[in-house]
């Protein structure tokens, strides 16, 4: 049995080495593989992709059955369309960029978040929206919090056959929870989202999964399936009765300082409660 295990392990390593070499010397296959991978991660089966294509890019279903078949049909226009449809980074589809998701980060400049979110609302007025605040599972928010926090914007519109289709943007890098300015900027963004009518929800992931997200090693919808729990970021703006702390007050005060620098009155977000529990469901 030991010999069988060693042989199986060796074959597995050889298979990985062959796959790496094949991708290394066949960049068109990498593009095709990533295009199919991305659509499937976003909930669109490969045989459904042709239904989404504009008339000028029409392809038969069989073209999407495998990366090897699709690579012969690739064109810059097809890849441009796929990147725009999924809101993913075009250079990642090319196998060049390290990050699959577009990143819209305005650390210490919350006015940039306000302007960008307002623009998304204007451009896609009928979508549902959700600001997700992802932190490490098991790390309670407070003075002893540790691990990274990552902010994700989700835009939900109508998909095929009455289904929902989501696009995602990363709104932060890997912000450490033990660094007060990062917590305060996170709270400021929660306040801005709330003032614009964007639902807010907190999710928890294993540390390894959070690191895969920030390193660009996993797609957001893939990690959505690996959530370990939830929490309520809006409690950092308006805590539940009897649960306020001096630490929370200091962080909210710091967040209001960043908001004021951007010409935003932090008090305007109070009294505009959103159903974060519904957003988490």
Label each PLM-derived region with a short phrase.
Residues 54-74, 83:
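Recognition helix of helix-turn-helix/homeodomain-like DNA-binding domains
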Residues 81-85, 103-107, 117-122:
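Charged, alpha-helical interface segments at or near domain boundaries
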Residues 1-25:
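Short, cationic, amphipathic peptide segments
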Residues 89-110:
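Short amphipathic recognition helices of helix-turn-helix/homeodomain-type DNA-binding modules
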